[in-house]
Design a protein with these regions (language model features):
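Single conserved hydrophobic/aromatic residue that forms the stacking wall/gate
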Residues: 1-7, 11, 224-234
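Beta1-alpha1 glycine-rich phosphate/pyrophosphate-binding loop at the start
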Residues: 62-128, 136, 187, 205-209, ...
Length: 234
């Protein structure tokens, strides 16, 4: 195990052990025990400085809200928009396309990446469509009320003083399509969260999207065929 070990790892105590351990004397709890425990837990202190950034709230409605811009999300948003629906397409990551950016697929005689770019370009040109990247839909409430967090300018080197840093959207949608994709199921073993261990989907994204090689001599462990298309790429 190469992980840096914290205080809890050293003493290997179960969670909440201090509630039964530091019982006596009672007067020590607030002055000695609790301050020590909170310091050991690494709890931070909230800043008292004024935040100079701008933040906005926005209220919007739509016929269809699509979360995720993979193949199913793009196809759904495009079909609805072509039929005149007011559509909002939300993508959490900076780039649209989802698995189309990493998988070798072909749609309408185009590569997945080129097809995604074509659809996004068309969607952006439609007056009834709002396309947002760096935007995470994190709340789904009664009567199709959804809340979306947009990172507006954190990635910009230069920006106007009137440009908000972040924007919180309150969206009332008639219909919602959750096209957030699926998460690759990991193989569970001890310390499988240490640096240098990747899911195949993550390894492909590093290579295809960011141009980063995860290793020169990788060991690939898989129980299903999903690693077959990944192996030659690595």
């Amino acid at each position: 195990n190469t992980r840096s070990r914290g205080l809890g790892d050293v003493y290997k105590r179960q969670a909440g052990f201090y509630y039964k351990t530091f019982m006596w004397p009672k007067s020590f709890w607030y002055k000695i025990y609790e301050p020590f425990i909170r310091k050991a837990a690494g709890l931070g202190v909230a800043s008292i400085e004024k935040d100079k950034e701008r933040y906005e709230h926005k209220f919007e409605y739509c016929d269809l809200l699509v979360t995720g811009s993979g193949p199913s999300g793009l196809a759904s948003a495009y079909a609805a928009a072509k039929n005149g629906a007011k559509v909002i397409l939300a993508e959490d990551k900076p780039r649209f396309g989802g698995t189309l950016l990493t998988d070798d697929v072909s749609i309408d005689n185009l590569s997945g990446k080129d097809w995604a770019e074509k659809i996004i370009t068309e969607l952006k040109s439609m007056p009834n469509v709002t396309v947002k990247n760096r935007s995470q839909v994190f709340g789904y409430y009664d009567h199709n009320m959804l809340v979306m967090f947009e990172r507006v300018s954190d990635h910009l080197e230069k920006k106007s003083k009137f440009t908000p840093r972040q924007r919180l959207w309150y969206i009332r949608a008639k219909e919602t399509i959750l096209s957030t994709g699926s998460i690759e199921r990991p193989i569970v073993f001890g310390n499988n969260d240490t640096p240098g261990i990747f899911l195949s989907a993550a390894a492909k994204e590093y290579m295809k999207v960011y141009g980063v090689l995860v290793g020169k001599k990788p060991l690939i462990l898989s129980l299903i065929h999903i690693s077959e298309p990944t192996r030659p790429r690595i």
